[in-house]
Regions:
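Asp-based, Mg2+/Mn2+-dependent phosphohydrolase catalytic module
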Residues: 1-8, 44, 118, 122-220
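N-terminal helical cap/lid subdomain that shapes the substrate entry/recognition surface
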Residues: 4-98, 105-106, 131
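Conserved G/P- and acidic residue-centered "switch" motifs that form tight phosphate/ATP-binding loops
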Residues: 13, 17, 114, 172
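Hydrophobic residues in well-ordered beta-strands that form the structural core
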Residues: 20, 112-114, 189
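Substrate-recognition element of Asp-dependent hydrolases with the DxDx(T/V) motif
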Residues: 29, 99-126
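Structural motif
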Residues: 49, 113-115, 170
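Short beta->alpha linker loops
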Residues: 53, 91-95, 116, 148, ...
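Surface-exposed amphipathic alpha-helices with a cationic face
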Residues: 97-104, 177-181
Length: 220
């Protein structure tokens, strides 16, 4: 007999929570850095900055400010490169297919609320057959204010007619957890991702997991 859950909806952040997109970010950024004679970066270096967005990636790794005359050119080149590479090496985090199967078996809906624009999110998600049962995708294109504002999470809940208190939001960045808390959902911090520190449990009163396989036991 299947266990009955109070949770009706699980919402995922995308980069660093649902999908490990770091390899394709690394390829794309290094291609542009090489183009302009800049030093390559390592996988670990870029993992620490993926969740900050493309503008901050360019600012940090090109070591320029936003007003630099070539900033927009570098950013445009990076985004073009990323669009070509976004589903080449990216993969679901280990254990994620089993988690999604569990949610399907228990009739728990799941979706994505991300700060990644739909132009990049849609082809990435569609390249994974395991994500065919995703019920909703909310990107910055769909809201006035992105995370840490709760608007995207609340929009997803509203569209699926699920109350926030029946929802879990999973993320790997402090802004994800802030958004979930503000929306009134339960939250789970994903330490296997890119941006949460090991001491995050001192800042947020919620469950934390170091592996995807730990998530099922946290679904009430």
């Amino acid at each position: 007999m299947l266990e009955n859950h109070k949770t009706k909806l699980v919402l995922f952040d995308l980069d660093g929570t649902l999908i490990d997109t770091a390899p394709d970010f690394l390829t794309s950024l290094n291609n542009v850095l090489n183009k302009y004679g800049k030093k390559n970066v390592t996988a670990q270096e870029i993992r620490n900055h993926i969740s900050e967005g493309s503008s901050k990636l360019i600012k940090f790794f090109f070591e320029i400010d936003y007003e630099h005359e070539d900033f927009e050119k570098y950013k445009s080149d990076f985004l073009s490169e990323y669009k070509k590479n976004l589903n080449k090496k990216s993969k679901l985090f280990e254990g994620m297919p089993d988690l999604l199967d569990y949610l399907d078996e228990h009739s728990i809906m799941y979706g994505i609320v991300t700060n990644k624009f739909f132009e990049y999110t849609d082809p990435l998600v569609n390249s994974f057959p395991e994500l065919k049962n995703i019920k909703i995708i909310i990107c910055p294109d769909h809201v006035k204010t992105s995370k840490p504002d709760p608007e995207g999470i609340l929009l997803a809940c509203n569209k699926l007619n699920i109350r926030p208190e029946e929802t879990i939001y999973l993320g790997d960045h402090p802004n994800d957890l802030k958004a979930g808390l503000s929306a009134g959902t339960k939250i789970i911090g994903c330490l296997y991702g890119y941006s949460l520190e090991k001491n995050s449990n001192e800042l947020f009163d919620c469950h934390f997991v170091e592996e995807v396989s730990e998530i099922i036991s946290k679904i009430d």
